[in-house]
Amino acid sequence: AATDTTADTAAEETQADNTADFDTSEYVNVLSREDGSGTRGAFIELFGIEEKDADGNKVDNTTDEAIITNSTSVMLTSVASDEYAIGYVSLGSLDDTVKAVDIDGAAASVENIKNGSYTIARPFNIATKGDVSEAAQDFINYIMSAEGQAVITDTGYIGSDDAAAFESNGAAGKVKVSGSSSV
């Protein structure tokens, strides 16, 4: 594979410049998502920040000093604008304004998540309230098809490599979709 050595050199120079200017005596500004965020839920679970109290109830031990953001875009902008900030977003939301943290020496990448070396990952789920309309089922079938998985992959998320081709059930209608701001 070809490499963009100009971009690599610029990234190395930027990293060197940032490292030289970074004052290790400064406090790190912790950013977190709002209560109810699926990204926050996954993060606190994966990192052991969520524990159970004596009664078995889940307790979120995110620091009280965390700056709370209400969306992925606000998280990215906030981290990008503060060299002492740290936060979290889904892999597909990463852009060149922030740098992902390596976990146990593994970079955040589709390949490393698929091979298990980057262990901080979560699935996205489709949830419905009971039975769905034929149009909604057709939409779900599309998402789970090779064509739908290609859209997922093309947008930076991890799709399935073994999905079958989409076969419409011929339904028409309106489907209401809501959920994570990560997708």
Regions found by a protein language model. Name each.
Residues A1-V183:
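Exported/periplasmic ABC-transporter solute-binding proteins
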